[in-house]
């Protein structure tokens, strides 16, 4: 029996080396296959690993990075907004103020079609915002309803602005002189009552015959609508002014 410290025979060591070499060759083949994968996938996987790690802010809430818009593509769509006949002349006069926000801010293609009396808007490769077409349509619609261009531009800059439309007959059925008096109470002498409601509630109001359009935030529209409805129902302007003062003081405290 050989001693435990005796040197092993050379043939046995060759067999061991052959087995180890076969294993190494097999590993090299697997490495070549893994190297054939594009580097972009590896980078994407590393990014996923980094993104999977949750980052917490000071209060302990998870903090997520903003979604990148580089990979987002806007569909090529078009929209036509009809223009009423009585708004065509104001549209032509203020066209130089209307199209720059649509072209420069929203990156839309705009055309005024005089034959069909519509404003046509299209998205293109430069358009970034997916809601640009809808914002542009709302802006043009606000102008066609009778709002000033400077007031309608606020729809492009702020997301929480809306337009609410209702008629006098939705509140109370009035005809003839009664309807005229109700509209006169809303406007007031030289528009004094209408301006008071606008300033107190931070809204813009358009009186188009028996239709009333209100532009503003959700809560502001509700306050302005309550004042207009009370005038239609016959409340004296003095009482409405008192309520508006209360509303204005509350809004100053809130904001």
Curated annotation (Swiss-Prot):
Keywords: Cytoplasm, Nucleus, Ribosome biogenesis, RNA-binding
SUPFAM superfamilies the UniProt entry points to: Eukaryotic type KH-domain (KH-domain type I)
Residues covered by the KH domain: 176-228
SMART domains membership: KH (SM00322)
Principal place of residence: cytoplasm
Family affiliation: Belongs to the PNO1 family.
Name under which the protein is recorded: Pre-rRNA-processing protein PNO1
Organism: Debaryomyces hansenii (strain ATCC 36239 / CBS 767 / BCRC 21394 / JCM 1990 / NBRC 0083 / IGC 2968) (Yeast)
């Amino acid at each position: 029996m050989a001693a435990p410290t005796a040197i092993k025979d050379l043939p046995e060591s060759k067999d061991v080396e052959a087995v180890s070499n076969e294993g190494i060759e097999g590993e090299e083949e697997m490495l070549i296959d893994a190297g054939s994968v594009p580097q972009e996938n590896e980078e994407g996987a590393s990014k996923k690993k980094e993104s999977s790690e949750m980052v917490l802010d000071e209060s302990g809430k998870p903090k997520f990075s903003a979604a990148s818009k580089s990979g987002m593509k806007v569909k090529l769509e078009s929209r036509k907004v009809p223009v009423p006949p009585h708004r065509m002349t104001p549209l032509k006069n203020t066209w130089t103020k209307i199209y720059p926000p649509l072209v420069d801010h929203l990156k839309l293609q705009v055309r005024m079609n005089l034959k069909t009396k519509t404003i046509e808007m299209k998205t293109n490769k430069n358009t970034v915002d997916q809601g640009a077409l809808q914002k542009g349509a709302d802006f043009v619609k606000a102008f066609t309803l009778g709002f000033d261009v400077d007031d309608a531009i606020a729809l492009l800059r702020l997301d929480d602005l809306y337009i609410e439309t209702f008629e006098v007959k939705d509140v109370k059925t009035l005809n003839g002189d009664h309807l005229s008096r109700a509209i006169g109470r809303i406007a007031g002498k030289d528009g004094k009552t209408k301006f008071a409601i606008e300033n107190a509630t931070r809204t813009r109001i358009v009186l188009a015959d028996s239709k009333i359009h209100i532009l503003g935030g959700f809560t502001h529209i509700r306050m302005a609508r309550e004042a207009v409805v009370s005038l239609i129902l016959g409340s004296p302007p003095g009482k409405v002014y008192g309520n508006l003062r209360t509303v204005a003081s509350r809004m100053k405290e809130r904001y």
